[in-house]
Amino acid sequence: MAVISLMFLAVMYVVHHPLMVSDRMDLDTLARSRQLEKRMSEEMRQLEMEFEERSRAAEQKQKVENFWRGDTSSDQLVLGKKDMGWPFQAGGQDGGPLGWILGNLWNAGLFCLFLIFELLRQSMQHEPAFESSSEEEEEEIRVVPVSSYTRLSDFPSQEALEAFYKHYIQNAIRDLPCTCEFVESFVDDLIEACRVLSRREAHPQLEDCLGFGAAFEKWGTLHETQNFDVLVPIVPPQGTMFILEMRDPALGRRCGCVKVDSECMCKHEKLLGDVLCLVHHRDHSAMLSKCTSSIKAALCTSSHLDVCKTVQWFRNMVSNAWALVAHKYDFKLTFPPSTTSCKLRLGYRSGRSLSISLVLGVQREDTLVYLVSQAPEQEQLTSVDWPESFAACEHLFLKLVGRFAPENTCHLKCLQIVLSLQDHQILPPGASRPILTSYHFKTALMHLLLRLPLTDWQHSMLSLRLQDLLWFLGRGLQQRSLHHFLIGNTYLPLTIPIPKAFRNAEPVNLFQHLVLNPVAHSQAVEEFHNLLAQVKTLPCSPVAGGL
């Protein structure tokens, strides 16, 4: 009987606690396991209550029967039946005190064994991480609740926010999806013409473009969608390879250098036996070294890709490619000066114009992280430093949210309303530019998308979610802390391809400069308070009472 009990316990443990696929349990599985444990505990409690009720009923019935039979030892018989339930008692004989003690020891041992297994399982959950094992599970990737807080008073109602959005935002970006589609199609046409021109040249090859930023991610306002940013990845030609040499992030700059070298397996692996290295063999090295030398002479500074030289080479190629495709389009194309990107300006006869920035990028490993040619305005880098960009990763995340979220969600509307008000904000005296940027608000929104279920972003919850967004950023300003969305974020879905080291890295504080500069922090706080005042008094819309 003891062996059967032990086997049953082992089987039940395997059924309810299956082996995990890795040493870290994802957040969805953790939530479901806790719900299952809670449900099992409630069911066990209910069964215990039912068992006790039945035992008391049987005891009472036995007492009544014994009383009518005239049995004066009814209480002892009933108690004896209760003691006979332990595995160490055989037949109808009473095991006595020793049997009762052994029975309790056996059950206590089983309980301790089960408790040890449970503690071991819990110890494997100390580092939760998002791991979507299927497309069905990706839809349920937000389970961490946002801390409760006091709702803002005099906040606009749902109707007021909708009226503001339709009047100031929706009409202004009505044609944005069609414009984005045209921009990508036009850039693809230019890239294809560039490939034709560079077919016989030993220069970097161009891959398919990727639109990113406010316009392509559908959260931009009229101001944010005046410029269209397009990423154009480049890869080395045959016989040449790019070696990425990353700078130390502790220095405060996330960038790297792109070293150009001859491609050869002997630089990656130790060749066995007398295997011939075709690159370094004297019969082939001359041709391949000529290819590498050509790139170094034209585009490099000390064997590293020079941003300015590479952009100028790309700009000249696009200019030549335009001559091949100009007959297809009815606008005038000009090239505004720039040293970090190839800027295009499309001028139509109607007076309308479009501005496009073609940003070159070198892919980091097999991820969506790129070293790009265009640096943020506040960073001063050398000509061989290529800043690290996570734009493609963030674009994919928002695309996944749009795919699995319910129809007509309000997450993009929240960001658009805030940015639209910020565009019309007057800077504090003495300030040359705002401290709070659209990227800060976008980062706060993406954090909230991970912390709240997608069902909480329905159309009817616009007012609540907008308050959540403002509260999240306001708390970050108060604490001088806003973590980067991708670096050190253990809740990030594994479907977002980033370097493995980024998931286990220390979070990067986007407000670190506010810690070091109290004046900048004061300006950021003032900008935030002005934004709150703007939200509470939306133009051309009534204000409702506090929520």
UniProtKB/Swiss-Prot annotation:
Main location, first listed in the record: membrane
UniProt keywords, alphabetically: Cell membrane, Coiled coil, Membrane, Signal, Transmembrane, Transmembrane helix
Subcellular compartments: Cell membrane
Keyword Membrane: yes
Ranges facing Cytoplasmic side: 118-547
Membrane-crossing segments per the record: 97-117
Gene Ontology MF term list: receptor ligand activity
Sections of the chain in a coiled coil: 28-66
Signal peptide: 1-22
GO biological process entries: calcium ion import; negative regulation of T cell receptor signaling pathway; T cell activation; T cell differentiation
Family matches, as Gene3D superfamilies: 1.10.1410.40
Extracellular-facing ranges: 23-96
SMART domains: Mab-21
Domain of life of the organism encoding this protein: Eukaryota
Pfam families documented for this protein: Mab-21_C
The keyword Acetylation appears for this protein: no
Family, similarity comment: Belongs to the ITPRIP family.
Purpose: Functions as a ligand of CD3E, inhibiting TCR-CD3 complex signaling to regulate T cell activation. Induces stable CD3E-NCK1 binding, thereby preventing the CD3E-ZAP70 interaction and subsequently inhibiting the activation of the downstream ERK-NFkB signaling cascade and calcium influx.
Name of the protein in its database record: Inositol 1,4,5-trisphosphate receptor-interacting protein-like 1
Gene (name only): Itpripl1
